[in-house]
Amino acid sequence: MNIQNLNCLIDLHLHLDGSLPLHTVKELAEQQGITLQMTDGELKKKLSVPAGCRDLNEYLTKFEFPLTLMQTPEALEKCMHDLLTELEGQGVQYCEVRFAPQLHTQKGMSQNEVIEAVKAGLYSVAGVKPESIHAGIILCCMRGSDNGQQNKITVEEAARHLGSGVCAVDLAGAEALYPTEQYADLFAYAKQLRIPVTIHAGEAAGTESIRA
């Protein structure tokens, strides 16, 4: 089966900061005064892991450069708009796009402002016409040693925006360093707020981490 011939695709696992169209990265860099002294092929390599990569930490490094470009409301709205437009052109009818609001606050935005900017990009494309792509947003909490309060805010923002663009919360990041068990209370809180949950597990810590 040739996937290119299908026009009813669904994608349930997309990271906004890991799925940007190449032209979006180039345009954002130009707008922000960043000179990309590399070919398109070199830029794609900078943003992508090689085939067969099995190192989660190598995957995570590929998010670093896009994140530097995604620190303003305008940039975030554009990223979501451009990604959904590209997916729609590929025949995707429904997708769930995830990102960590706390990673986009380096220039002073609150997590709520980050979410509102991404939602603006979503609503500029999704559901505009009956045949338009439909999409949901998943808000990622991050594994780490000093961001417990930020994760709590993410869960509370998910509750605020649930059913209005946001459909779930997630846990992402360096699994081997920060086991899932450490976040039991956080996701008990999400359950208390009746927020659907998905968790990255088994990527670096084996099958036992999935059972956790």
Residue ranges and their predicted role:
Residues 1-195, 204-211:
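Metal-cofactor-binding active-site regions of metalloenzymes
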Residues 201:
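Cytosolic ligand/metal-binding cores
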